[in-house]
Amino acid sequence: IILSISDYFYLKIMESDRLSEWFVPKFGSRNFRLSIGILFLPYTGMVVSFAIWGSLSVEYDLNRIVAIGLLYFFAIGIAAHCLDALGSKKKPWGHISHRKIWIVSIISLAISFSIGLHYAFLDSWLLFPIGIIEGFFLFAYNLELFKGKFHNDTSFVISWGILPVFAGAAIQSNTISIETIILSAIAGFASYILIITSRKYKILKQQNANYEMYYKKETMLKIITSTVIIGTVLFFLARYL
């Protein structure tokens, strides 16, 4: 099949445009699809799940499970991903208003920090050190501060996998149990597999690799995220029922 020049450049744009990613809705306006896509909902679902793991590793209260879930949704799902779009050297989402992204990020962080501070001052002081560390990684990793020194797999595993589990336990009982530590290790390992697979996936797409090659990585990403999210639902039902 011989492609015209316009077809060729269209395909090149689609290959580099994040709107063509598997986690972006295929329906709706461009702004709607961008707004949903930039949240990386499957990955956000993972980090929220890890926070729930932490809560379920100790004696828990349903209201606090909801609170820690919302905290991480606003902090990571919205704020971190918006800051990542700002800090990225490339513009995979196209030219988005920096002002709007900063406003959304600040509002989201204000909500998440308000939730965290409420429970930290109430009876969960362990949220203070966890929040400080998470806050550091949120800016250092996503905005690639300090010449990108902290934009690496280790920072991702700590902030995305391990600390959310600790935070989930801390908001419930202000303690870190043996079960919490075990679950944090599992979450850290899952996060490592996710980020390694994600990087390989992006490289293959950027190199215009054969569809079957990067589709395998895409399938792995779907399996990892769905396994964690579905597993969390089953874990919750087992503990709740």
Regions found by a protein language model. Give the residues of each.
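Multi-pass membrane catalytic core of lipid/isoprenoid biosynthesis enzymes
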Residues: 33-36, 42-52, 65, 70, ...
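Alpha-helical transmembrane spans of integral membrane proteins, capturing the lipid-embedded, hydrophobic core
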Residues: 47-48, 52, 69-77, 109, ...
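C-terminal ends of transmembrane helices
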Residues: 80-93, 136-150, 196-202
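Intramembrane alpha-helical segments
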Residues: 100-172
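C-terminal transmembrane helix-loop-helix hairpin of multi-pass membrane proteins
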Residues: 189-241
